[in-house]
Amino acid sequence: MSTELAARGAARVEWIRSRMPLLAATREEFAHSRPLEGQRVGMSLHLEPKTAVLLETLAAGGAEIVATGNHGSTQDDIVAFLRAGGMTVFGARDDDWDQHHVNVQSVIDARPSILLDNGADLVAGVVAQGLADSVIGGTEETTSGGLRLRDELAGAVPFPVIVINDSPLKAIGENRHAVGQSVVESFMRITNLMVPGRRFVVAGYGWCGRGVAQYLRALGGKVAVVEMEQVHRQRAGL
């Protein structure tokens, strides 16, 4: 079964890999320069095809990969594919929250030197367990993780962390358009309902909320927005 899963994952990764030319170019460069030789990358991100291509790129640069996913989003065929490629991966689709925390701890126990985080779980763990001195840097994917770094962990993290969600490119490309479109498509597929003429309430008008509202309106939905921040509320009204 794991062989079948790995083959299914390989086909999905191959399809998305062919549509990610920037990472393909980076992977080719990394294969020659090996900038991550001797580094162990600990990751806690969604385990799906695009993430697999990212991990392949890091591995091509010499990194050892130790990874887990996020609760509820892990795709078993991608886990099987990554394991077949020699990476250490913890997690399964049906993991509950307790198992997810065990998986995160397993990544921390591997003593990674670079962290790719979502929600600041890895960063908080290495700081709380006195392991931060072995980490040279990391990234944080989300707004919630960025807020946690700036609030709960403010002044406690001795290594640099780049908050990917602060990038205007991510805000426009992923948050507004990718999230906006995929949320609306998921609504239609899960409910088997169409958007035109229906009333929707979008809670929050940040980049993701703007995208969801934009795609709902484009499909004929009637959209109301709930937003606490005055400028965002005014923007929604316009």
PLM feature spans:
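Anionic-ligand anchoring segments at beta-strand to alpha-helix junctions in alpha/beta enzyme folds, i.e.
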Residues: 43, 52-90, 235
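Short His-Asn-centered micro-motif
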Residues: 43-45, 117-118
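Glycine/serine-rich phosphate-binding loop and adjoining beta1-alpha1 elements at the start
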Residues: 1-36, 69-74, 79-198
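Glycine-rich phosphate/diphosphate-binding loop of Rossmann-like nucleotide-binding domains
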Residues: 45-63, 174, 178-238
